[in-house]
């Protein structure tokens, strides 16, 4: 099964100090902090994925990658080999905010095999990092009642290139590391 989501970023005071402290969704990961719900969303999605082959793709603010209050949960997600890929997107991808965002892909089964007609290699203990912050050349403008807002839009060629990076990594069979400096890097979690 698949989950796609764009949860509210950095939601504060999403629970009281006592509420949900023993929630089953946090088992094995720890309690997400009261001051930011980003990792509550992540663990909620992970809990609801098919445990054998579920995949989730979702957007979060870039701060979720470095928040000290969630370091232990983030480390456990990596240790449990749930994170498949992280795509850092350009600023101003949304017309309503200029917040920097990251596309996360979680995968319950990174083993090789035939998936959706494609032969995938074993990607266990690897995470693909893709830095698209400089891919901000294509802009679109929207008029609101009071002003104009410009935001970044990927064109078809860029979308194809992003898919090629991700799909290429999933099927990569060369001995050399899957790496293009300043664009993408496949990191071992061993």
Regions found by a protein language model. Name each.
Residues 1-190:
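A conserved structural/catalytic subdomain of Rossmann-like adenosyl-cofactor enzymes
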